[in-house]
Amino acid sequence: MRRLILLIIVVTGIFVNYSLAQVDSHFSLFEYSQNVYNPGAAGSNDAMCVTSLHRQQWVGWDEGRPQTTIFSFDMPVVDVLGVGLNIYQDIIGFQQDLDISANVAYRIELDPGILGIGVGVGVINRAIDGNWRTWQSLNGGTVYQDPAIPHMESKIAFDMNFGATLVGEDFWIGISTTHLLRPTINFEVGLPSYIARHYYLSGGYNYALPNPSFDLVGSGMVLSDGSTVEFQINAKLLYNKSFWGGVSYRYDDAIVPMIGVHLINGLSFGYSYDIVTSKVGSYNSGSHELMVRYCFNLQGGKTPGRYRSVRRL
C-alpha cells in the first residue's frame, strides 16, 4: 500500500509538472547551497571553497523517493570578481535532472559589507524512463510502457540564473531568480514542459551572546515559483566558532534538528534530519542531509575554523 501511495504521488507530481512547472529541490542546510540558487554568492567566502551536499528524502519508501546531490566550487579571482561552478543532480520517480552551471559575480565594497551581483549560465539535462513496474514485471513479466509517457528520453536546455548577495561582518542577505528564461523541455512523446522561474529571498544574522564562547545564529529563506510559497527558518547555537547545533522549521513540512563542526584545517561537516510533519510523514522515516565543505585561504593557506563572518557558518 505504501508503494502504491508513493507511486501515485510521484507520478502525479511529475506529469502535472510536465506542462506546468517544477519546484527546485529544497535543502535544510540551505546556507551551504547558496551558490546553486544565487550566483551573487560566488566568491563571498573570500576563500576557495568546495562544497558537497547530499539529501535522501522520505527514507523508508523503496522506490521513487527524491534524492538530490550538489557539488559546488567557488572562489574570488580578483578583488572585484568571484567565480563558481555547480553540478546539481535531482532524481525523483521516473525523472532525473542534471544541471551544470557556471557563476560569475561582480563584487562591490559598500559601508555595510560586500555586495555581489552575479549571473549563472548553464544547461539542464532532463531524462525520463517511463517504465512502470507492475506485479507481472516483478514476477518475470514484461515491464509496462505507457505510449503517452516518454520512455528512455533525454533532452538538454539552456538555463540562466541571476542574483545578488550582501555580506557584512555579522549578517548576509540575498535575493535571486533561477531558470530566468523558463527553459522548455520538448520530448518526442507527451506535452512540452517548461521549468518555471523560482524566486529566492534568504538571509542570516549572527548575534553575539554575553558569554563570548557562544553565538546565536539565525537564518531564513523564502522560495516561490510564482504559484506556491515555501519558507524555512533556522536557529543555531555556535560554540567557540567551531561547534554548532540547532533546529529548523519548514512550514507545513518538517522540523529539522541539525548539528555541525568547523575544523581548524578548513574542513566543515553538517548533518540534518527532517522530522516530516506533513501528511506523507506517516509513510516514511524522515529525510537525511549531509554536508561536507573544504575552504582554502588563497592568501595564507587553509582557512581557519574560527570564521569572522556569519556567511561562513
Q: What residue spans do the PLM features occupy?
A:
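Sec-dependent N-terminal signal peptides
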Residues: 4-15
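Subset of outer-membrane beta-barrel
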Residues: 22-313
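Sec/Tat signal peptide C-region and signal peptidase I cleavage site
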Residues: 15-23
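Positively charged n-region of N-terminal signal peptides that target proteins for export
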Residues: 1-4, 110
